[in-house]
Amino acid sequence: MIRKLVALAALAASAPAWGHIVFAEPEGQAGSYYAGFLRVTHGCGASATVSLRVEIPEGVLTVRPQPKPGWTLAIEHTPLARPVPGEGGATIRERVSAVIWTGELPADQFDQFGLMMKLPDESGALYFPAVQTCVEGRNDWTTIPADPARWHDAETPAPILTVKPAAAGHAAH
């Protein structure tokens, strides 16, 4: 009986995040490359997901989305106010501002949408507002709480990636 209560309590504690779009790997290291997946666990009620649009935070300059078989991929760019040095001597003049996957994901299935990116040198919370469009309806996962520790309290929180300080002697690869 106690095991059942403990399991039920654990399930209840995790319930608020069950329906949110989340990063499968919720932490990365400042100044390093991060490859992770945004997990979409349901549609809009019984309606299939047909598009996922993810906004990329301004501090992230290098992003490469992962293509998905059967889905189309669109990448939106925004010019930088001032060019910055990039990898291998290149100059970065624009950044990826949004990634949009279009396809079909039945409401009773889940999938993951991959992003590889160079994280900023500063630690802290990065939010990736996402709009999940369905055959009927949509979910706007765009709420950014004033306090990252209160993320789970938001009804429709933007996916969050926590950037941890770089380890001493860390070199980005």
Where are these regions (language model features)?
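N-terminal edge beta-strand
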Residues: 18-40
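Extracytoplasmic/periplasmic copper-protein system
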Residues: 30, 133-173
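Low-complexity, serine/threonine/proline/glycine-rich extracellular segments that form mucin-like
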Residues: 33-69
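Low-complexity, intrinsically disordered segments enriched in Ser/Thr together with acidic residues
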Residues: 96-124
